[in-house]
């Protein structure tokens, strides 16, 4: 009789577990359908690579690109749906998160064509490269929708591990190994700091891990103004600062940019910032709702340091990738203005609009650098002298992207900064906006210095690299140029039609 009762209880428990798993798979699983498409693409790549003796490179690229495009399509089809919380509160789906997921997918879709010829020339393992890119994209997407402390920690670690492996992908390159080691050590330290901050939040809120429940827990425990919350805020700012790479958390950025393969740098330069920005807005806005003045002050300091140091140090650089590294530090200072403004005065809409333009400007610049590097084997700024005489199309494309990064009208970068600064001014961030304007002028100086080198036609200034410049005969070259053309167009034309883009961002968010 006892055995019969125990058997019935076991059957009932098993049925409940099965029904709960079925519910998660059927209902919650549909909320991460774009992510499931990427997972299916990853599995398909692994199966083909492990079962096929011949490596059909175009087929691998097709599977990766198709997975990303299908994921974007699935994301667009569920646009403007009601916000949903799934997986027992671990994941949230809403318009704000989906915009950042769209930006990450867009970055990865544009980055894969940049890597085609580079991988063929350097004879890198193609399957592993694409697997790391897709897995990092998946981690970034989960980070955008993370709704509890555990997911907020695990998702960026998924992205970070793939980033470490990608940065050290050229194992025979000493600079790449050095960059990977610095990246790994500083990334591990920042993750430890972030976990320590989460422990303070967890304890102060009475054992809560969901973001909104942490706020309720802090109210119940009356700990929202306690020293523990201040410590958590400080450590979270340091931990997230590593992902965003503002000054003074920028030490790893120039070395990783210079030592890593150029397509990898292009990927990391945009996806990491998009994912970290999405995470920062949610963490600062929700758990630290009662400490808004404190985190506003911290971010203002980071923004000022980033805009000043990033743009001033960029002037002295001789490597294109190091120059873009310091330029990206300055650019993240502008993005932080939008984070500080927040929901009021269209702060988030201006930040998202500028990030969309920054993706096209930055990836367009890196596409030009990849092409030039493959055809000349150099990354030195002086070696670009006279490029216009050999390849006017590449020189003009690079010039347009650099001018857009500098914020010259009527390019997209100008209108993106104008919208961002206007929102900051309306929110009363006068000092930040003035510093942003001054440092933008500084950035225009070093961008114009490069453009002057590109357009020079005097033989004594043309280096042997440009004098012996030859177009690549590889058919895959078209993929890089296609990505470059898309980015150049996106860096110029959207500036003319700015209002519809702003209207879409505002209508989606609010």
Swiss-Prot record:
Chief location: plastid
Spans traversing the lipid bilayer: 24-44, 57-77, 99-119, 124-144, 149-169, 183-203, 227-247, 295-315, 323-343, 354-374, 395-415, 428-448, 484-504
Enzyme kind, highest EC tier: translocase
EC number: 7.1.1.-
Coiled coil: none
A Gene Ontology cellular-component term: chloroplast thylakoid membrane
Superkingdom field: Eukaryota
GO molecular function, a single term: NADH dehydrogenase (ubiquinone) activity
GO BP terms in the entry: ATP synthesis coupled electron transport; photosynthesis, light reaction
A Pfam family hit: Ndh2_N
InterPro entries in UniProt: NADH-Q_OxRdtase_suN/2, ND/Mrp_TM, Ndh2_N
Membrane topology designation: Multi-pass membrane protein
Alphabetic keyword roster: Chloroplast, Membrane, NAD, NADP, Plastid, Plastoquinone, Quinone, Thylakoid, Translocase, Transmembrane, Transmembrane helix, Transport
Localisation per UniProt entry: Plastid, Chloroplast thylakoid membrane
Catalytic reaction list: a plastoquinone + NADH + (n+1) H(+)(in) = a plastoquinol + NAD(+) + n H(+)(out); a plastoquinone + NADPH + (n+1) H(+)(in) = a plastoquinol + NADP(+) + n H(+)(out)
Subunit architecture: NDH is composed of at least 16 different subunits, 5 of which are encoded in the nucleus.
Functional description taken from the UniProt entry: NDH shuttles electrons from NAD(P)H:plastoquinone, via FMN and iron-sulfur (Fe-S) centers, to quinones in the photosynthetic chain and possibly in a chloroplast respiratory chain. The immediate electron acceptor for the enzyme in this species is believed to be plastoquinone. Couples the redox reaction to proton translocation, and thus conserves the redox energy in a proton gradient.
Protein family per UniProt: Belongs to the complex I subunit 2 family.
Name of the protein: NAD(P)H-quinone oxidoreductase subunit 2 A, chloroplastic
Organism: Jasminum nudiflorum (Winter jasmine)
Lineage of the organism: Eukaryota, Viridiplantae, Streptophyta, Embryophyta, Tracheophyta
The gene coding this protein: ndhB1
């Amino acid at each position: 009789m006892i055995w019969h009762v125990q058997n019935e209880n076991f059957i009932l428990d098993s049925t409940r577990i099965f029904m709960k798993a079925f519910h998660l798979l059927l209902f919650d699983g549909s909320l991460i359908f774009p992510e499931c498409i990427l997972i299916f693409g990853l599995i398909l790549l692994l199966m083909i690579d492990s079962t096929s003796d011949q490596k059909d490179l175009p087929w691998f690229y097709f599977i990766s690109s198709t997975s990303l495009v299908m994921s974007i399509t699935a994301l667009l089809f569920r646009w403007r749906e009601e916000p949903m919380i799934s997986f027992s509160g671990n994941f949230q789906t809403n318009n704000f998160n989906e915009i950042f997921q769209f930006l990450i997918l867009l970055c990865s879709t544009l980055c894969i064509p940049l890597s085609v010829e580079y991988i063929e020339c350097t004879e890198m393992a193609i399957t592993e490269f694409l697997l790391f890119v897709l897995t990092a994209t998946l981690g970034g997407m989960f980070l955008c929708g993370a709704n509890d402390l555990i997911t907020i920690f695990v998702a960026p670690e998924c992205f970070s591990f793939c980033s470490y492996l990608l940065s050290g992908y050229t194992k025979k390159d000493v600079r790449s190994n050095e960059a990977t080691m610095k990246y790994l050590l500083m990334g591990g330290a920042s993750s430890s700091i972030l976990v320590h901050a989460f422990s303070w939040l967890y304890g102060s809120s009475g054992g809560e891990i969901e973001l909104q429940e942490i706020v309720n827990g802090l109210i119940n425990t009356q700990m929202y103004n306690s020293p523990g919350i201040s410590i958590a805020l400080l450590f979270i700012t340091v931990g997230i600062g590593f992902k965003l790479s503002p000054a003074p958390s920028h030490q790893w950025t120039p070395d990783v940019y210079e030592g890593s393969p150029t397509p990898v740098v292009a990927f990391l330069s945009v996806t990491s910032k998009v994912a970290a920005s999405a995470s920062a807005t949610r963490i600062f806005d929700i758990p630290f709702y009662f400490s808004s003045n404190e985190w506003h002050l911290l971010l203002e300091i980071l923004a000022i340091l980033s805009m000043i140091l990033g743009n001033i140090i960029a002037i002295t650089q001789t490597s294109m990738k190091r120059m873009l590294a310091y330029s990206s530090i300055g650019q993240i200072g502008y993005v932080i203005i939008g984070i500080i403004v927040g929901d009021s005065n269209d702060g988030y809409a201006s930040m998202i609009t500028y990030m969309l333009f920054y993706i096209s400007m930055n990836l367009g610049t890196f596409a030009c650098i990849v092409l030039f590097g493959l055809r000349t084997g150099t990354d030195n700024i002086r070696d670009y002298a006279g490029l216009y005489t050999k390849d006017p199309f590449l020189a003009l494309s690079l010039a347009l992207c650099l001018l857009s990064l500098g914020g010259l009208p009527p390019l997209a970068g100008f209108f993106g900064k104008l919208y961002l600064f206007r929102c900051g001014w309306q929110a009363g961030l006068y000092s930040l906006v003035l510093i942003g304007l001054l440092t933008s002028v500084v950035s225009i100086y070093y961008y114009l210095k490069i453009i002057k080198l590109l357009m020079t036609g005097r033989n004594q200034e043309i280096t042997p690299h440009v004098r012996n410049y030859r177009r690549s005969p590889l058919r895959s070259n078209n993929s890089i140029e296609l990505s470059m053309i898309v980015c150049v167009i996106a860096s110029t034309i959207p500036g003319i039609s700015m209002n519809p883009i702003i209207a879409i961002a505002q209508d989606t968010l609010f």
